[in-house]
Amino acid sequence: MAEQETISVSIFDKSFKVSCPPDEVQALRDSAHYLDKKMREVKSARTVMGLDRIAVMAALNIANELLTANKQRD
C-alpha cells in the first residue's frame, strides 16, 4: 500500500483528519481552504441555514464551476 500522510484541515470551523499521499498534501490543504471559502460565501448570502444545507449548496456551486470550466475547454 502506498505511503499516506494524515493531516488536519479546518472547514467551516470544524477540524477533519484526512489521509493522502505525501505529494498531494498541499493540494488537499488548498481544496479544504477553497471549500471553507465557498461554504462561508453561501452562509453570508443567506440568513439562517443549517450546516448540511450550506455544505450541499457549496458543493453544487463548486460542481457548477467545474462543469462550466470543462465546457469552456471543449
Ranges and model annotations:
Residues 7, 26-33, 37-40, 61:
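Solvent-exposed alpha-helical segments within well-ordered globular domains of core cellular machineries
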Residues 15-17, 26, 38, 45-58:
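Amphipathic, hydrophobic secondary-structure cores in small proteins
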Residues 30, 37, 44, 64, ...:
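Alpha-helical coiled-coil heptad-repeat segments used for dimerization/assembly
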Residues 52-55, 59-73:
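Long, hydrophobic or amphipathic alpha-helical segments
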